[in-house]
Amino acid sequence: MLVGVDEEKYVIPTITIQKAFKPGQDEYFTVEGKGEMVKDRGSLIPLVRLNEIYGTSKNKKSIDQCLVVVVESKEEKRALMIDELLGKDEYVIKNLGGSMDDVQGIAGGAILADGKVGLILDVHGIFSIVSQK
């Protein structure tokens, strides 16, 4: 699934996606020692701000300005905060090579319909990044 975060476009592998929704303020919580959470069907899911992980924006957006995509890897769930859903398509993963090989949370790149490169997210790698914080 192609998503937008700030001016960037990312591809989230559909096999990892549980659901996408727009949470209300009553579904957003900050839990001491655990950080930001989103409530879904009675469960609290840790919130991941992609713009903070990849440094695309210094502005902390309000939860009611965004969507979340709930993803799962190895029976662990996280809610990725995004700005918009841009569509669902099939993409071929291309190795980005060079200095991009070691970027945690990025599986590769894909050429998008507009000719630009979208970064393909490695969901398990993102989970590792946020676990280290």
Residue ranges and their predicted role:
Residues M1-K133:
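Glycine/threonine-rich ATP-lid/beta-loop region of ATP-binding domains
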